[in-house]
Amino acid sequence: PEPTKENLTQLQEVIRREKCDFGIAFDGDADRIVFLDENGKFLRGDTVLFLLTKYLKPKKVVYEVSFPPIFSQFLKKFKAEGIESKVGRVFIIDCMRENFADIGGEISSHFYFRKTNFMEDAFFTFFQFLKILKENREKVSELAKEYPILPSESFKISVKDGEKYTIVE
């Protein structure tokens, strides 16, 4: 199953029962990774991109328009230029290339790095996350607590193909 918040209850139970430092889950083709803290709390993609930005210190970061507005304020705090993009892989990658960005991310936990030629690579993201944990020696919840979790839900609305553009306008 997809590594969504709803599908991770077993992993959350294991993290709590075994007192794990954190948990991870990949999607089927390993281009997406989700993280859970030591309490089994799900970290959204914006929280993970916040951590990657804070500790890896990229100069330019591309993020989706669906990120909470506070995200751009943190980028300024970390002296990173934030570039907002349309939602979706193609838009993020194109925006990263056009702006020579170092890192990009989606709420859905797809992350992109210039170092990997903009490929979605969950394993590269995982190793960057491990590097952050090793260098900071703090619990994941401690590292993430500075970034406030604002209520945000996404939902799908079914519309006929011929009506989508009219509705968006």
What are these regions (language model features)?
Residues 7-15, 53, 92, 96:
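Generic hydrophobic alpha-helical segments
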Residues 1-36:
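N-terminal small/polar loop signature for handling phosphorylated ligands or for N-terminal nucleophile
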